Every structure is written in structure tokens, then in C-alpha cells.
């Protein structure tokens, strides 16, 4: 179904607003376990929004859910408990009054965004995600703003950050790690097919849905690059690939390096090149000074070693990550029926 473009004017300058259908960063910080209820059975990330059982999502005359196309104000929402705090604002659990649809409402302060000079980055995030609809990518349903704030209506990820779960358990087992690798490979293949490079895959930027399914979030460093070649440095120190440290041109293969680092961290509990100083970390990354504890299974070592290659062209392609024997033997990826239909 063709989606209707959000007609809100962009609050900065004369540029027109991007589409209201996109995915944006959400860093959800939780202190208490989630207790699913009828109101927390929310939509899957790549399908039309659905309300809780016994409740109906209101649609407009074209059959498109209102949450995607309607002009909202803050008065249209019941605001619940805070989910997280960030540099530019806060995230709250919220319910749209008309449809009772549960969302995460991210409230950004214009003054802080302007102070840090990141208006362009915010707009870029929205533009990049305008057409990314995938079961393992967090979705942005809509946005609106007033004189002081910008509000992003996001998919709610009830189980919060992957980072928090990793902190609690220290390491993940083979099944959970392989499942995450398959989910990531599939989602990134989708992104790369649309010429989108994430560039900052790490546990803090990965959220978990109701059934534990992965949701890629925080596209703050991502870029839509038709040439797929850029030279700017970004990302998290422990996850930076050699080509970015060395200031060389890079492409979508930076994401292959990142998921190799992630796989190692999930199994071991810390990134592979972590050191006491930044300079030492840089040195180890550039030299690909990779050492495995005896606890890392041989199959996982093989996968990680094929991803963490200094030469980007030698890194294992995403399709082969999904098909890797260790991933195939251990992954327990489960998609909702509607998601299976859409990615078939």
C-alpha cells in the first residue's frame, strides 16, 4: 500500500519534512522487568499497526491507520512512565487516546538540538529511515512538533536495550548469539540493498521486542550514500574498523566488521580489541590483533575471523553470515507470521 507523505513542515529552515514513515533511534533504559499486558501487544515492525486485543486501530478513508498519517499534538496521547533519558530529551511510554495504540514517545528539545548543531543529523536520520520497514528495524510511525519540542512516535520495544541484558548475564550462549547474528545479517542486507550503511552497530543501539526479537535502532551515524563510499570518521571506538581509523574511504562493509566485533562481545563479554588506552585499542584494531578465549566455540571463531579482516573486500558477505554453519546450527530465529510473509 502506498503511504501518504507527512505534510508537516520541517521545523528547521525551509526544507520540506521527510516522510512520516521511518525508523529512528530509541535508547530505552529499564529498571524493572516488563509484564506484558493486553495493552502491550503492539504491532510488528514491518506491518501495519495493530491495537490491543478487542481494540481497533482507527483508519482514515483510504484505509491507512491514522497513526501513520494523522496530524498529532501532545494532547492526543496519554503519557506514561519514562522509559529513558538522553542528551536531547526523554522517551516515555504513551498511548494514543483515540486508538489506544501503545508507542514510545521520544520528546526532543529544540533548544538542545540547536545548541549542539545537530538539526541536519536529526533530519537525516528521519530521511534515511523513511522507507525502511523490516521486522528487525525499530519503526517510526509519525512525528509532530510544537514551539519547544519535537515528538517522535516510535515503535515500543518492551524488553529494552540488548546492552542491559548483556550486562546482567555477562555473556550470551551460542543459541542467542547466533540468533542475533542471523537477525542482524538479514536486517543489514535489507539496509544495504537500499544503500543505507548503519556504521554504529553495538549493544546499546540494539533493542528487543516482546518476544526477544532484535530491533536495530539509533541511526544517528548512518548514512544514505548512493555511492556507498564515504570518508568521515564516526562510530564507537571499540567497534571502529581499520579503514575508518586510517581515514580511508569506506563502504557498507564497515557494518560487517561491526557485527564481527558484536559477535565476539556477546560470547566473551567484552569487545575483542578493548585495551587500557585509546592508542592501544587503535593499534590492535589496525593490526587485527584478535585473540580468542578457549570458551569461544570453533564455529564462532571461524565466523568472527572471517568478518574481522583488515581488507574490507575479504569480509564475509551478509548472505554467507546467515548461511554460516555455526549460525545455521544454533540460530533460533522466529518471526511473526506477517513478517515471514513480507520477507519471503
UniProtKB/Swiss-Prot annotation:
It comes from the Eukaryota. The active site is at residue 200. ATP binds at residues 83-91, 106. Its EC number is 2.7.11.1. Residues 77-327 form the Protein kinase domain. GO terms for biological process: cell cycle G2/M phase transition; cellular response to UV; cleavage furrow formation; midbody abscission; mitotic cell cycle; mitotic cytokinesis; mitotic cytokinesis checkpoint signaling; mitotic sister chromatid biorientation. One of its GO terms (molecular function) is protein serine kinase activity. Changing residue 215 to R: Abolished acetylation by KAT5, leading to impaired chromosome segregation. The keyword Cell cycle applies. Changing residue 106 to R: Leads to loss of kinase activity and severely impairs mitotic progression. It catalyses: L-seryl-[protein] + ATP = O-phospho-L-seryl-[protein] + ADP + H(+); L-threonyl-[protein] + ATP = O-phospho-L-threonyl-[protein] + ADP + H(+). Belongs to the protein kinase superfamily. Ser/Thr protein kinase family. Aurora subfamily. Component of the chromosomal passenger complex (CPC) composed of at least BIRC5/survivin, CDCA8/borealin, INCENP, AURKB or AURKC; predominantly independent AURKB- and AURKC-containing complexes exist. Associates with RACGAP1 during M phase. Interacts with SPDYC; this interaction may be required for proper localization of active, Thr-232-phosphorylated AURKB form during prometaphase and metaphase. Interacts with p53/TP53. Interacts (via the middle kinase domain) with NOC2L (via the N- and C-terminus domains). Interacts with CDCA1. Interacts with EVI5. Interacts with JTB. Interacts with NDC80. Serine/threonine-protein kinase component of the chromosomal passenger complex (CPC), a complex that acts as a key regulator of mitosis. The CPC complex has essential functions at the centromere in ensuring correct chromosome alignment and segregation and is required for chromatin-induced microtubule stabilization and spindle assembly. Involved in the bipolar attachment of spindle microtubules to kinetochores and is a key regulator for the onset of cytokinesis during mitosis. Required for central/midzone spindle assembly and cleavage furrow formation. This is Aurora kinase B. It comes from Homo sapiens. The lineage of its organism: Eukaryota, Metazoa, Chordata, Craniata, Vertebrata.
Amino acid at each position: 500500500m502506498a503511504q501518504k507523505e507527512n505534510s508537516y513542515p520541517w521545523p528547521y529552515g525551509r526544507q520540506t519534512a521527510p516522510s512520516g514513515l521511518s525508523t529512528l533511534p530509541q535508547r530505552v533504559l529499564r529498571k524493572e522487568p516488563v509484564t506484558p499486558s493486553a495493552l502491550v501487544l503492539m504491532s510488528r515492525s514491518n506491518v501495519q499497526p495493530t491495537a490491543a486485543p478487542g481494540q481497533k486501530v482507527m483508519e482514515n478513508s483510504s484505509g491507512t491507520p491514522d497513526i501513520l498519517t494523522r496530524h498529532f499534538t501532545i494532547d492526543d496521547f496519554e503519557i506514561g512512565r519514562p522509559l529513558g533519558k538522553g542528551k536531547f530529551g526523554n522517551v516515555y511510554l504513551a498511548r494514543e487516546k483515540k486508538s489506544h495504540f501503545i508507542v514510545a514517545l521520544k520528546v526532543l528539545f529544540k533548544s538542545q538540538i540547536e545548541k549542539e548543531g545537530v538539526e541536519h543529523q536529526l533530519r537525516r536520520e528521519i530521511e534515511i529511515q523513511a522507507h525502511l520497514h523490516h521486522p528487525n528495524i525499530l519503526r517510526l510511525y509519525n512525528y509532530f512538533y510544537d514551539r519547544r519540542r519535537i515528538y517522535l512516535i516510535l515503535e515500543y520495544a518492551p524488553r529494552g536495550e540488548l546492552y542491559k541484558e548483556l550486562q546482567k548475564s555477562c555473556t550470551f550462549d551460542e543459541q542467542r548469539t547466533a540468533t542475533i547474528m542471523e537477525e542482524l545479517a538479514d536486517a543489514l542486507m535489507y539496509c544495504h540493498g537500499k544503500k543505507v550503511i548503519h556504521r554504529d552497530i553495538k549493544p546499546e543501539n540494539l533493542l528487543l521486542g516482546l518476544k526477544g526479537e532484535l530491533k536495530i535502532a539509533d541511526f544517528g551515524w548512518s548514512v544514505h550514500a548512493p555511492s556507498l563510499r564515504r570518508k568521515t570518521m564516526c562510530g564507537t571506538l571499540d567497534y571502529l574498523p581499520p579503514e575508518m581509523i586510517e581515514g580511508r574511504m569506506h563502504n557498507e562493509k564497515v557494518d560487517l566488521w561491526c557485527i564481527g566485533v558484536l559477535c565476539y562481545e556477546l560470547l566473551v563479554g567484552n569487545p575483542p580489541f578493548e585495551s587500557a588506552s585509546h592508542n592501544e585499542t587503535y593499534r590492535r584494531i589496525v593490526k587485527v590483533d584478535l585473540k580468542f578465549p578457549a570458551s569461544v566455540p570453533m564455529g564462532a571463531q571461524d565466523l568472527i575471523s572471517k568478518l574481522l579482516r583488515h581488507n574490507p573486500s575479504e569480509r564475509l558477505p551478509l548472505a554467507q553470515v546467515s548461511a554460516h554453519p555455526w549460525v545455521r546450527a544454533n540460530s533460533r530465529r522466529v518471526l511473526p507470521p506477517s513478517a515471514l510473509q513480507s520477507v519471503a
